[in-house]
Amino acid sequence: MNRRHFLSMLPMSALPSLSAAEFLSQKRTFIGREKFDAVVRLALAGNWRAQPMGQRVALFGQALRGTRYVAWTLEIDDRVESPSVNFNGLDCWTFFETALGLARMIATPQPSYSPSDLLRQIEWTRYRGGVCRGGYLDRIHYLDEWFTDNAARGNIKYITGKIGPVTRMTGRTNDEMSLEPKIYRYLRASPALIPALNQIERRLEKVPFHYIRKEQVAACEGRIQSGDIIGIVTHRQHVFCSHVGLALHTADGACRFMHASLTAKRVIVDKPLHEYLAGIQAHAGIVVARPV
């Protein structure tokens, strides 16, 4: 009996933390090897490892500029969950997460870097407690929980309250996924997961959530650093955050929003953050986290 056969016979709860290849082939979980290699070469040639963490995140974010926007890049199977990266197409979540994963990866000096090295970093930040056991609910699906979980494990500092005055979110639910399960590939295939997902959502709603109103962001931009993770808080019902990207201070002195843009259909460095927020009525404000 080989190791893969043995692992397949174990209950999910008995599985240790494994690389993505143990759940799905890297032919499915790692797309764009040539671009990965090119970005890593650029980072090594520029000695990006010597930069502070936030600056490294910003550099990798800029290296991903122009990558086309592709929605649902996290939904790669009907039933099996596995850490994944797609350098040929990014959505807002996978953009910031890939830049962060690359920045974390090169912090450890190695002669070379492989897809497995990045996938391990993705697993560490994408999944609750840093562990994927092959189940859909191992993954963190709401950005507010991503901030809480990763801050608790020392991957980021949640600094919204230090950046500017905050307002507490009230009168809102955080249940978008359980209300609309048919738009999620895994939930369509496994509707039995919905009650457990709803329990997670109910738990998240009990966690106090504070944000900076968009009208106050312009006065706060000087305290935001390049590479900070910017969660966009929405006025929409049933979810707190609807978008995410990275801050980037550019040569003109502006604090700009770098993100995978559905409108532009690619990764871009957008307007100054406060202008970007003002231009979209549904945006209510921001939350901020700093990679460490």
Regions found by a protein language model. Name each.
Residues 33, 50, 54, 58, ...:
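Solvent-exposed, acidic/flexible segments
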Residues 70-202, 259:
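Acidic/His-rich structured neighborhood in mature extracellular/periplasmic domains
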Residues 200-220:
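Mixed-charge, Lys/Arg-rich low-complexity intrinsically disordered regions
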Residues 42-50, 79-89, 234:
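Second-shell loop/turn segments in exported
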Residues 5-22:
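N-terminal export signals
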Residues 230-288:
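C-terminal soluble interaction/assembly domains
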